[in-house]
Amino acid sequence: MKKEGSSGSFRLQPNTGSLSRAVSWINFSSLSRQTKRLFRSDGELSVCGQQVEVDDENWIYRAQPRKAVSNLDEESRWTVHYTAPWHQQENVFLPTTRPPCVEDLHRQAKLNLKSVLRECDKLRHDGYRSSQYYSQGPTFAANASPFCDDYQDEDEETDQKCSLSSSEEERFISIRRPKTPASSDFSDLNTQTNWTKSLPLPTPEEKMRQQAQTVQADVVPINITASGTGQDDADGHSVYTPDHYSTLGRFNSCRSAGQRSETRDSSCQTEDVKVVPPSMRRIRAQKGQGIAAQMGHFSGSSGNMSVLSDSAGIVFPSRLDSDAGFHSLPRSGARANIQSLEPRLGALGPAGDMNGTFLYQRGHPQADENLGHLGGASGTGTLLRPKSQELRHFESENIMSPACVVSPHATYSTSIIPNATLSSSSEVIAIPTAQSAGQRESKSSGSSHARIKSRDHLISRHAVKGDPQSPGRHWNEGHATILSQDLDPHSPGEPALLSLCDSAVPLNAPANRENGSQAMPYNCRNNLAFPAHPQDVDGKSESSYSGGGGHSSSEPWEYKSSGNGRASPLKPHLATPGYSTPTSNMSSCSLDQTSNKEDAGSLYSEDHDGYCASVHTDSGHGSGNLCNSSDGFGNPRHSVINVFVGRAQKNQGDRSNYQDKSLSRNISLKKAKKPPLPPSRTDSLRRIPKKSSQCNGQVLNESLIATLQHSLQLSLPGKSGSSPSQSPCSDLEEPWLPRSRSQSTVSAGSSMTSATTPNVYSLCGATPSQSDTSSVKSEYTDPWGYYIDYTGMQEDPGNPAGGCSTSSGVPTGNGPVRHVQEGSRATMPQVPGGSVKPKIMSPEKSHRVISPSSGYSSQSNTPTALTPVPVFLKSVSPANGKGKPKPKVPERKSSLISSVSISSSSTSLSSSTSTEGSGTMKKLDPAVGSPPAPPPPPVPSPPFPCPADRSPFLPPPPPVTDCSQGSPLPHSPVFPPPPPEALIPFCSPPDWCLSPPRPALSPILPDSPVSLPLPPPLLPSSEPPPAPPLDPKFMKDTRPPFTNSGQPESSRGSLRPPSTKEETSRPPMPLITTEALQMVQLRPVRKNSGAEAAQLSERTAQEQRTPVAPQYHLKPSAFLKSRNSTNEMESESQPASVTSSLPTPAKSSSQGDHGSAAERGGPVSRSPGAPSAGEAEARPSPSTTPLPDSSPSRKPPPISKKPKLFLVVPPPQKDFAVEPAENVSEALRAVPSPTTGEEGSVHSREAKESSAAQAGSHATHPGTSVLEGGAAGSMSPSRVEANVPMVQPDVSPAPKQEEPAENSADTGGDGESCLSQQDGAAGVPETNAAGSSSEACDFLKEDGNDEVMTPSRPRTTEDLFAAIHRSKRKVLGRRDSDDDHSRNHSPSPPVTPTGAAPSLASPKQVGSIQRSIRKSSTSSDNFKALLLKKGSRSDTSARMSAAEMLKNTDPRFQRSRSEPSPDAPESPSSCSPSKNRRAQEEWAKNEGLMPRSLSFSGPRYGRSRTPPSAASSRYSMRNRIQSSPMTVISEGEGEAVEPVDSIARGALGAAEGCSLDGLAREEMDEGGLLCGEGPAASLQPQAPGPVDGTASAEGREPSPQCGGSLSEES
């Protein structure tokens, strides 16, 4: 154990040692000799862990190489023995090189450490096992030990206890306060004396014990690393950091920036000494990746250290400052942070700030502690730690945090959550660039910076320190300051950091981001982070976001702080996820970078900052302050932690953007951390259950979950408001502190899963609960701790709902995960519905499956999320304990929210979305997070949400409350309000998203208004009820911006309000039961649908109440898409707008449809509500009702009304719905309403189930959708056309084509939405005009419902795989009867596969189908198309292939679908089998591939869930493209290029003169990319005109990817 403990401890402690070591290692190259010596010393010290604590401290101070060298030699020996990670790295300093005494020390330390660790384990009742964590990575010990030990060693062994005695701290201060003098002297002294001190293992043991206790009570011990000299300590740590950073190449900056750094550096091996520990640690974290590797990695590489590298490398370059440097060393983060930052601050000129920083730091320990420990013990930090300790703590936290962050992987970081410092470091890393830019360059620079610094610094210091009371509440409340503090933990140096470039980031991230996340903080954050971000923070930040990964790491550490305070001293394992997160973050970064550079930066910077700061705030401080963290972290941790509660915070602060981003980032970030995470995750699961509430609800979350769930369900509305969100955050976060950890874990695990992908997040969310699910899960979980995913995507608005959602989710375990899910899944919120179902159906299974998927997911940010989404859905559900515990239909809502967790996919998508548009994502997140929360009054709020949404989502928070209420109370009457809220979130987020897209939406106005506003209200309305209010409001608010909005607004307003009323009334009927679905008889009413539609919508909403989440998911998807769309194509702007709308209103049609209709079944058609709420509602009706009889009607209406084109889609949708119905509910089908009624029922049900499934699917597809979103925008029209033609070849062709152009904008969004929703099936219909799109959405939604049905399917992922192989023929045989289904299924089923169940089933089906298709005729073509991505494939070939593929694929999907629910494959068709079938067949042929594409995407997701498609899924997720293979091949490309490709494609499409073509192609590309082949074929046949061509090209293009993906999956 000693060795392990040492190793673990080393890793943990080595947060300091590790950091030192990492730095040493890094310097090893740079400063080989001294570094080696330092390294050895550090290693030995670290190895000693506790023993080495003092030594480490010496190390930190090791201004004198001589002592350090000796110690390092000894330490090295120990380290080598202890730290496997370091061993190899330290092997460079072979034990041979060590003196015998050192060797002996090593041995002794090992033995002692083992005993100590064991004892610690005993002492540690936080569920973290020292050995476990040590094994995993000393990170956890680092939490107590690493933070303390590392930093204690650094800070002072004296501070043996994390919150060691004040005298020691004073001594430390005395010794260390003199930065240079004490540093050098102390270094020497400490080195020798501390060596002796540290050598006595009993001391370390005691330390460990104390630390464990302290950590538990206060993860602040980690801060001890910063050991009482706020300044010196910070500097001392900073020394490491600067050194580390220096090593990273930032030493100069650090040196200059770091007063102490300079001094110490100069004293010690200017760079060597300092760098060695951090570097060492860092390297350890990276598992042998050198700084070079790290740096190489840092930019976008995945890789745990990559993030750290990112931190180092990116921050380096980004920070261009010591900040960057030490950002480089996230572990040293805070230390470096403070050190660098302080000096930097001095350099920057904020000498006062520097003093303040030190002051701040000094006070911050308290604040940090408070924050960090607020999580665990809200006031623990402050209360727990004596003032001096606090200061020290702060410093420790600061210093430690970075060290922790730098710690072996983010694990240590994560472990050292309390050290927002880590965050700082990471954050600094992430944001410093931004901040540097922002602070120095940006507006944020002076005022924001100053303000943040001041405010954050003050507030952080005061608020946290003085105000820590609010700790949970204060920062929770959105006290940027505290969150800032949270970040402040790193913020100790963070104020400096803030002052420094990074200061803005850390403070910005923590203060700004977290604060900004919250509200005022948002301000700061926005000012700083955003400005900084916007500046280049994005790019830098993104890069830096690797640092963010560090942050992520930090987050877990924070979590740990909190968790430690609570039960997760080892929570740091989350740090591992954190590490992963760094990597994930990097991934996210890439993702976000592509689309959301700024956002990415913001997310990264902020997210990362958030991750680090927030995450780690959320983690430790965020744990208690998850919301806060979330808030502060808003995004990052929202992604991870906020993914849980942070999500809520994110919802609040980062609400949409950051959280989203964070999620995205987180998701990627977490990836790296998966190994360390497992222990953390388990601990997290138990302890952090906050966000893991879903997963971990069982353990610590059980009560929290129960409480949160209750509060979420019952009170959430009130609770969820921003305050509730915060409340839940506060109460959840604080209570959830552990949960935060759990969230961190769940969130991290989930998030990690999501980190892998937001989905991973979600997965991990569930995974955390399935701690057992291995490190990966843990890893994923951590990111979730951050949300997932990414995160937080949905979190902000949803974070209130993510506090809501997360609250909802939290109870569900979704908290973190949920937030992530809601945030992360903001895109996937709808997925949650489906996810929920799957979740509910087989949450655990899914969860499990997800884990693997997560793993893959982790790699592919968004794609993973996509797959994991469904998986996560399940994962979340099970993991969330809430999903499971709350599997009720109401729970479904919760579940949906859990699903939001599940929305991880969404989060992933969110990641994508993040990339797409921070705004969109944020919006999404807000929507997602908000979905539950935002829709407060969204009806009135919607305008706000729209504007507000654009804003921070102020309305969403209120809605969040409502939504929270609704979310958790989906079953409750309250839920209805939430739906509006949800709507608003969507609306809001969408609006928010729309805000960007709004202009875009303008073009789409006609349909978009209807489409856009409609679905959100509808979708979110719980869905319909709120939707209408939201929609009208949205429309009015948002729509007004759109000219269109006037009329649709009007009609919608009229309709929507009724709908809202009815639905609100109906909310009580949230149960989406077959009965409810049946009730939902979608009436063919089209125009008069206003009332009826409202009713229907209401019914649908009611039935889809549960699907609300899915809606959300879907919406987030749409949102993501919208974002993507928006980002990708302004041209797609219409679609983007629609997409934006989709997420909100745009996706209203699609998403609304998907979310609404799919979730609502019928209401989905509301999405098309472009025409009017009435129509939208009617459309759902028609969509559902007309499916059978409306085919012709649909045709005419679509023709007559483009918006009603969706009506055209309905037939396919009907089939789709029917088929899903047949799968989902033959009973429903059986329940004969009119055909429409039946269909409506089925649709409703299907929508519901599909909603859930589709939520999964959408969750799965959201990324796809989002990717498609951008692409979908273009593709959508094509798809719509394809769909419409399929559905109504007659009408479809002409109106279709015409509409596609028109719909290109509207449908683009709609279709995109549909696409997003049901890539293929719905996608085409979607494209069919908004109507078609809506209808398709409906289909999709229904398909989603089918997918909802799939919940069980996810359980049978393996079965599905087997069945797919077995039932291939069977499916084919069934295909005939399922032909309609096929047709619809082709499009729809793909969506269904997209859904959780289909995802699972689809994976194999799609895999098989796609394989078959690919093999068939488009194998090469698909690949070519994929490669070309131009849609160059010949239409004929594509068509033929598509048709054949469709047939091949459709049956599989059919089988997949029918497999899950083969009840009446043809039953739906029955309604209008001939027509539908024929249309669908044609549609399938034309659009089948596309749907299949979606399906493929879904399957991929599903598959992703399944281990088989892990890699593919992972990449796919990451790419946000369903096609994993291609995605995998071009992850970066997928992320960046894909959108670009989409944009380019969109441009091409436009150039081609077929915006539809462009859209179709883009969508296809995205969707096709998702599905690859399916869309190509589908699209081609679909639109004879350009749409066809485009579809062909596009479809083909995606097809190859799909094929590749399938192939890979297969």
Swiss-Prot record:
Residues annotated with Phosphoserine modification: 24, 198, 328, 568, 639, 1089, 1167, 1233, 1386, 1388
Coiled-coil residues: none
Start and end residues of each stretch annotated as Disordered: 145-169, 433-477, 531-602, 649-693, 715-778, 791-981, 997-1535, 1566-1610
Tissue specificity of this protein: Widely expressed. Expressed in adult and fetal brain, fetal eyes, adult lens, kidney, liver and intestine.
Residues modified as Phosphothreonine: 1392
Sequence ranges of Polar residues compositional bias: 433-448, 578-594, 649-667, 740-760, 767-778, 851-865, 1041-1053, 1122-1153, 1405-1422
Biased composition (Low complexity): 715-730, 895-928, 1001-1011, 1180-1193, 1461-1474, 1504-1516
Keywords from the named record: Phosphoprotein
Compositionally skewed regions (Pro residues) per UniProt: 929-946, 970-981, 1012-1031
Basic and acidic residues biased stretches: 1240-1249, 1373-1383, 1447-1460
Example of a GO biological process term: cell differentiation
One family name in Pfam for this protein: NHS
Transmembrane segments: none
PANTHER family for the chain: NANCE-HORAN SYNDROME PROTEIN, NHS-LIKE PROTEIN 1
Family to which this protein belongs: Belongs to the NHS family.
Protein name: NHS-like protein 1
Organism this protein belongs to: Homo sapiens
Gene name for this UniProt entry: NHSL1
